Amino acid sequence: AQVSIICNDPYFRSAKKETLVLSVSEARFEFPFSANIGEPIPVSERNYSTSGIINAGLVSTGMVVEFKAIGKITSRPWLTNLTSNQTMKLTGTETTLNQGEKITVNTNKHHLSIVKTFTDGTTKNILNTMDESFEWVQLLPGKNRLTYGADEKPENLLVTITVDKLLLGV
């Protein structure tokens, strides 16, 4: 007799998840200040540059990416891991987000999904919105550089990444 044991997810997970907000506001207002009459005074500025995230685990891991519309409209969001050169881009009318709506992409193995959440809390599976070159972006061990955008109004997008640190078992 032979007994086979299959473990599809043989990793221990860190108790604490790491969260990174890619699109952040940076303070621009300082005291003392001077102002020219008729010119606006910048209070803050959105930062759209690349962000670094460290995968402290010993193996590549997926993540949960949340694209949330914080302005009137945005559409066709994408995320690129510049370290691994992987890009996930969403296309089609289902990817248009009105203020308060969000798209959540889970790239963790055995949990792959793309779900749109509407402002009333209802959800819809939009797995069919993957671009033809879509990749389930993974984080390599060590430092990863991520960037994001959207084909329409990327300034209306708030992007949050949540990562589990995977640890090898015995």
Describe the predicted segments one by one.
Residues 1-10, 144:
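Oligomerization/assembly interface segments of phage tail-like spikes and tubes
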Residues 8-12, 70-72:
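Short acidic/polar capping segments at secondary-structure boundaries
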Residues 13-20:
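Short, charged, solvent-exposed linker or helix-capping segments at domain edges/interfaces
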